[in-house]
Amino acid sequence: MYAPQSIVIVGTPTWSQDVDIASSSPIERTNLLYSLHFYAATHKEDLQSKLQTALTNGLPVFVSEFGITEASGSGIVDTTSADTWMKLLNENGIGYIYWNLSNKDEACALLRSSCTSLSDWTFDDYSPAGQWFLQNQQNNASIYDKAAAAPTADCRHS
């Protein structure tokens, strides 16, 4: 069933990374977003180039999964690459969802594994990835406020 009043997120091949390929033959609907997944320590210029191609071709993109570690969820926390990604997303009005809000003992988790609170977290409860994410959200609050003030059902990138 087609839901014209709803936003539909469409995956792309190769773990939702081939948005450039999808942009060459997009589905002709106005309420679709194409999913992109990235992990900042693993996916760098090559995937950013694919995103830029998709945007140039007018494809509406939503990052439905990202982290600032390696794609495994472990390894280094790459804030430099993460900052580059956030700049690209913010400059192009692309929304995103971080993976993952948990206290699992892995680098991509936003909470430290020692955190047992279900809410009301202190800054020290956040993992290094979580501290970066929290600061990023606070530093870019004005961008998000502007985006929330002007929602649209037409998802096409302009």
What residue ranges belong to the model's regions?
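Non-catalytic accessory regions flanking glycosidase/transglycosidase catalytic cores in CAZymes
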Residues: 135-158
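Extracellular glycoside hydrolase catalytic/binding regions
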Residues: 1-95, 99-100, 108-139
